[in-house]
């Protein structure tokens, strides 16, 4: 399934039904009095977090969603039926923004969470409602209230326990495929990964969700390369695993490039726990490896882990370092569900 983390949609709640003007007409009852029923209430537009979703791709193919109108009132004091709500299914981690793309309306973090985004209009009163001691035969009724309409933005920030960051070709996808059942595209050219990938990792009987974020280059926060639009997905991660390619020209400069982009994107990423690892150590000579490790240690101001996603050397140590930060509690079913991609229509009801 294709990945989409942002979508613009139009929503409209249902109009209320009109009230009815009617009078009783029965045998032997000369003045039956008013009997017009009230109109039904319009349906609401509801956003709900669904299990098994991690993309907004369905909203690329359908952008307009309208709840059902309430039916009109009828004679014999019959009220109109309420309109059905329309429920839009979204993945956990979705944020709802107003049309200006800045005003946050709601942030969904729990499975099954529901939010009424637009309430249906109230039904109009029938003439029976206006009967009084001074007005025994009212001939007026109210129209139904109009529903609400608006354009909104859906923005997805995947919820994972740990995030993989680094320059393009740092070996992030290889690492993810090695430690989980995820099957990201792997090739020897930059920007092989074009959208985030999720995998469930099991280490020492404990599980956590790992997100592979497309590679960053210098100037990403200004739109270079794939830009920084995917960095929102690591904002919710508890820990970052920063992979540096040992075969690159200068490991210290590579680290500072990505670190600079993270800091430029959001201050919250500066506060994230970061584990630094020098990857692809199987592809360099011992002498060069020592130089790269020293360069990286000076730049990161911490001793980097040494590992190879291809041979598996150092991988268990990296995973245990992640688990130590994430905590000993096993990941919940809700988090694991975020790593499964299941087809789902956004529209129910």
Swiss-Prot record:
Localization, UniProt: Cytoplasm
Organism, scientific name: Rhodopseudomonas palustris (strain BisA53)
Name of the gene: obg
EC number: 3.6.5.-
Protein name from the UniProt record: GTPase Obg
Domain called OBG-type G: residue spans: 160-327
Residue numbers binding Mg(2+): 173, 193
Keyword terms of this UniProt record: Cytoplasm, GTP-binding, Hydrolase, Magnesium, Metal-binding, Nucleotide-binding
Obg domain mapped to chain residues: 1-159
